[in-house]
């Protein structure tokens, strides 16, 4: 009787019958051999795909290198091999443009540019005028000292309108136009009554004129 040969297990079965084949195919050894057999082909196919991708990548890299080498040779062919031009730097709003004339002193400011901040001049410095209404207190070096101007020549501050005086108060304006402190009568919570006669004497005095009539 012929025997059955299993290609996966590389062995001969004892009998060539359907029951024996089914029993052999259900065994764990046969399943493991089938799994390893197909896994071997998967690994080979995967490795071949990886090698193909690597070759394609190397071919693209070689093409890029050839293009770069041709471009470098084209640059070297120029006389003097001038460097590549750089991008221009745009000036900021406050930066003066190279090659342009400076702005005059009385010209309007450029929009977006902050006006220059000048230091505060020292009083009495040469070239600076004193503030309006205030005489210069310091003399230039080497000049004789000037006398102090009288206080009456200085401008006085404007006076403020004072509200009308309260009845019973007195206010006397001073020479400068400023009112003096007003004296108001003090308010008494409990005024003192008459010492003699008490409440009856007060009523008698109040009804006296009516009795005379």
Swiss-Prot record:
Subunit structure: U1 snRNP is composed of the 7 core Sm proteins B/B', D1, D2, D3, E, F and G that assemble in a heptameric protein ring on the Sm site of the small nuclear RNA to form the core snRNP, and at least 3 U1 snRNP-specific proteins U1-70K, U1-A and U1-C. U1-C interacts with U1 snRNA and the 5' splice-site region of the pre-mRNA.
Gene3D superfamilies, per database record: Classic Zinc Finger (3.30.160.60)
Protein family per UniProt: Belongs to the U1 small nuclear ribonucleoprotein C family.
Protein name: U1 small nuclear ribonucleoprotein C
Cellular component per GO, a single term: commitment complex
Keywords: Metal-binding, Nucleus, Ribonucleoprotein, RNA-binding, Zinc, Zinc-finger
Top-level taxonomic group: Eukaryota
PANTHER family xref list: U1 SMALL NUCLEAR RIBONUCLEOPROTEIN C (PTHR31148:SF1)
Region annotation Disordered: where it falls in the sequence: 143-213
Function: Component of the spliceosomal U1 snRNP, which is essential for recognition of the pre-mRNA 5' splice-site and the subsequent assembly of the spliceosome. U1-C is directly involved in initial 5' splice-site recognition for both constitutive and regulated alternative splicing. The interaction with the 5' splice-site seems to precede base-pairing between the pre-mRNA and the U1 snRNA. Stimulates commitment or early (E) complex formation by stabilizing the base pairing of the 5' end of the U1 snRNA and the 5' splice-site region.
Location(s), subcellular: Nucleus
